[in-house]
Amino acid sequence: MGVMVRCLQSFGYILCIYTVRFALCDIYMSEKQRIQSGAETKETRSRLRQLVWSYSITGMPKEKYDPPDPRRMYTIMSSEEAASGKKSYWAELEISGKVRSLSTALWSLTHLTALHISDNSLSRIPPDIAKLHNLVYLDLSSNKIRSLPAELGNMVSLRELLLNNNQLRVLPFELGKLFQLQTLGLKGNPLAQDIMNLYQEPDGTRRLLNYLLDNLAGTKRVSTEQPPPRSWVHLKEPDRTRPAALFSVMCYNVLCDKYATRQLYGYCPSWALNWEYRKKSIMQEILSCSADIISLQEVETEQYYNFFLLELKEHGYEGFFSPKSRARTMSESDRKHVDGCAIFYKTEKFSLVQKHTVEFNQLAMANSEGSEVMLNRVMTKDNIGVAVLLELRKEMIEQSGKHLASMEKQLLLMANAHMHWDPEYSDVKLVQTMMFLSEVKNIVDKATRSLKLSSVSGETNAIPLVLCADLNSLPDSGVVEYLSTGGVDSTHKDFKDLRYIDCLTNFNCNGKNGTSSSRITHGFKLKSAYENGLMPYTNYTFDFKGVIDYIFYSQPLLNVLGVLGPLDPHWLHDNNITGCPHPHIPSDHFSLFAQLELLLPFSSLVNGLHVPGCR
C-alpha cells in the first residue's frame, strides 16, 4: 500500500508530508552503481537485476539473495478489501519530505526489512535504530548526518547501507561488525583521505570493514570483560559404600587453523582468528579444567607435535594422535596441516595398553557389499576416530574401606571421533557412527580375550567405555538415537531412503551372521553425560547454534557425578556476541567437561566370609 500522509499520528507525533510505501515482496535495493556514485541509469538497473548474490563481501556463504526490481510496486487496499478482512503485508517503509527527526514509534516496526530515509534533513540517527534487527537495506543518503551511532554495528543482517552525500567525518569502528554487508555507500562525505583511499580500492567495502573490525577492540567504547566462569552442575554423589575410581574427561573441538578464516567467520577480527592468538586461550581452557583425559578434535598435525603434546607433557600428560586419511596421499609439507583427533591422559593416573586408529573410508570400502551409496557417499569422506585402552594405576582407586575383589588390572577404553560435517549427509554420519562403534566393540572383545579379562559379575563388557565426539548431529538425530537407545532401524529417515541395508548388518553387534533384524545395534549401554538440555549449544556461530558435541559413557560400570555448565547467556547477549570465535572465545565450540565414577569389583561379607564378585 502507498499513501501520502500529511498528519501521521500513529508514529507518536505529527510528521509532515511523509510518503509511506509498503512493499509486498522482499525489499532490498536499487542498483549498486547508483549507490556508489549517486547516479541511476536504466542500463545499470537491468544489468544488476541479473546478478545472483550468494556470498557476502567477506565471503561467508549465505542464503540466495536476489536484488529485486528497483521499480518497487505497491497497491492501495480498497475500502471493500479492508472491510472483507483482507490482510496486508508490508516489509518496506519509505519516509520523505525533508523530515528533521524521527518518531520513537518507528523503532517498534521490527518486522521491516528495508527502510528508505534518503533526501531528508536528518542530522542524527538515534541508537534505537538497532532495534530494527531484520533490516537488510538501509538508505540514509542525502541527509545532514554528522555522526553515526555505534549501535549501527549490531544490525548484522544488513546487506546494503547507503550513507552517500552526508556530513560524516568519521565512521564508528563498530561498522566493521556488519560482516554480511555487500554494499556500503560513502560518496559525498568529508571522510579522512586514508579511509576513502581504502574504500576506493578494489573490493574496498570488504577491506574497509575488515579494517574497522580489526581496530574495534582497541577503542575505549568496547567492553573487554572476560566471560564469567562456567558454573559446575552437580548431578550425583559418589558411592561411598564401595571402592570406586573417580576421573574427569574433557571433549573439545579446538577449530583447526586452516578452517578459521574470515570467509567462514566474518564477524571475528582477523587477529583473533590467528592461530598464534587463539592457541594461548585454547591451552588455557584445557589446563583450567585439568581433566584426567582430554579428547580433542580438529587438531592440526604440526600443532599436535609442536604445541599440544609439548605443552601437555609439561603438565603430566601423554598423548595419541591420528590425522584424517587424506594425509596418506599428501606430501610432507602438506601433511602437517591435516587435522585429526587426539587423546591425552595423565600418566600419574593411567598407563597406555593399546592405541587404535579407525579410518572410516577404509571400513566403508571393506564393508560395501556392492553398495553404490556406501562407495560413493561414505567411502569418499576421510573422517577418523581414535581409541586408547588405558589401565588405571593403583593410586587412582579409592577403596572406601571396602575389600577389592581379586583382579589383575582395571582397564578403560577411551574413544574419540569427528564425524562428517555436512547437514545434507545425515546418512554418512550415521553409518560412520555405526562403523566406529562396531570397531570399538571389536577392540573391547579382543582385549577381553587376549588379556583374559572377565567381569566378575558376569557382564559382557568388562571394559567400560567413554566416547567423546564431535558428531555434527543434533540430539534428535539418528546418530544420537543410535548411541542412546542401543540401536536404530535400517529404515530410519536419516538414511534418506538410500540402500544401505546390505552392508549395515556388518556393523550389527551380532555380526553379519547374527539374527536377522532391521534394527542395527551396537551392544553397549550408553548414556550422555549432558542430558536434559544441560547445554543449550556446544557449537555457537552466527548461522548455527546447537548441540553437536557429546560425552557418552557405558553403564552400569560408569556414572556421571557432575558436568561443567554452559557459558552465561547473559554475557553473550549483553556483549552482542552473535557467534564464535570471538577475541575472548578461541573456538566455535564450547568444551565439555564431566567427572565420572568407575565402580570397581569388591568382596562382600556373608556370615563373616569374603565373597568375591560383587559389582
Predicted segments, located by residue:
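The feature captures the LRR N-terminal capping module
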Residues: 1-128, 134-137, 147-150, 173, ...
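Intrinsically disordered, low-complexity regions enriched in proline, serine, glycine
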Residues: 103-104, 125-127, 149-150, 170-173, ...
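Metal-dependent phosphoester-hydrolase catalytic domains
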Residues: 173, 231-238, 302, 349-350, ...
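Residue-level marker for buried hydrophobic side chains located in beta-strands
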Residues: 186, 249-250, 467
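Catalytic metal-binding/acid-base residues of hydrolase active sites
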Residues: 191, 255, 300, 420, ...
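N-terminal, active-site-proximal structural segment of metallo-dependent hydrolase catalytic domains
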Residues: 213-340, 410, 433-438, 442-455, ...
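Structured beta-strand-rich core segments of catalytic domains in phosphoester-bond hydrolases
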Residues: 219-246, 293-421, 512-523, 551, ...
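Active-site flanking residues adjacent to catalytic metal/cofactor-binding acidic residues
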Residues: 252, 296-297, 417, 468-470
